[in-house]
Amino acid sequence: MEFSSKLIEKAVNEMSQLPGIGKRTALRLVLHLLKQPKEQTGFLSQALLNMREDIKFCENCHNISDTKVCEICANSVRNHQTICVVEDIRDVMAIENTGQYKGIYHVLGGKISPIEGVGPSQLNISSLVEKVKSGKVVEIIFALSSTMEGDTTNFYIYKQIAESEIIISTIARGISVGDELEYADEITLGRSILHRVPFEKTFKNN
Amino acid sequence: MEFSSKLIEKAVNEMSQLPGIGKRTALRLVLHLLKQPKEQTGFLSQALLNMREDIKFCENCHNISDTKVCEICANSVRNHQTICVVEDIRDVMAIENTGQYKGIYHVLGGKISPIEGVGPSQLNISSLVEKVKSGKVVEIIFALSSTMEGDTTNFYIYKQIAESEIIISTIARGISVGDELEYADEITLGRSILHRVPFEKTFKNN
């Protein structure tokens, strides 16, 4: 792509570094900004800069937060003895949206993935193990996505905390609510049969 | 969507103002920036700001340019008597890529579109009419996309310059090179029959 303007070229090049945004899309976005008032570009740049400079991570659960300890960890009503292990802030948001979880979280910041060069030392695993060893934790819930990397990470952590006398659970895998059985893949359907739950549980409150 | 951080929320809100980028995509992009070195966010913000602040438009053809007169208009080898009328810089880039055009351009900056509230006065039409009336132009080539808005814009300009003694042409519509006839729509196929060209022209150079 040849540009008639170095300024446009530079903006497009920087924009197309973002995942899923190619040169063409980047050019479309940049031209859109050109048509909008100057302030919009100013607001966007400033918001990104502020976010990148001032962002903090909760020193307890490592979630993204504006304060030293995030709102969830600072909430004394929540059950601090149950820790849900997730990959990143998006998973926290997804679980919070269900309104079904009253414990706290531990954000790993990724999954063990040799292909992408992510090893255990780059993730917030040691602080989780320490928490468990401190004896204040009653249950750990693994809520990583059910991929090769997720399972590897689960197992890596499990090996380090298996000797502690705590409950270690993982979120249930099974047929989505509202799904037809015939379209489910075999592994999911198989798991949902193996891990069947007492029928009474499905209509009684816990 | 509820965010645990106002900084993230603001960045996501600004990002999702861009066309085709929803809140979820914006969050993905913002989290990507968080994982990259701080410099990348700095470069991106700076490139966008510089682009928006310092961008110039060629005073002759209104194309985006870093200088007062763009490279194409400043090039004395090009034929300044032939003007190709296009919508924006993307069309200039597309035509330049063909390597088939040696004239200069006139960038309208959009198409007449009552639905989007774009009238003739918001486009660079009057300066085009002036150029034609100055008598230095021999041919005008309309190269707007073949939509209702494009045709309206073509016709609006045509009405104002029809009395000048210049050649007014429009780019050929027809079956794409490499396309099968049976899959072409009727209107395009019809046009390509009506506007058939002497066979000799297709293998002789001009």
From Swiss-Prot, chains A, B:
GO terms for molecular function: DNA binding; zinc ion binding. A zinc finger (C4-type) spans 58-73. Transmembrane segments: none annotated. Keywords: DNA damage, DNA recombination, DNA repair, Metal-binding, Zinc, Zinc-finger. Residues 81-176 form the Toprim domain. Pfam families: RecR_C, RecR_HhH, RecR_ZnF, Toprim_4. One of its GO terms (biological process) is DNA repair. SMART domains: TOPRIM. NCBIfam families: recR. Belongs to the RecR family. May play a role in DNA repair. It seems to be involved in an RecBC-independent recombinational process of DNA repair. It may act with RecF and RecO. This is Recombination protein RecR. The lineage of its organism: Bacteria, Pseudomonadati, Bacteroidota, Flavobacteriia, Flavobacteriales.
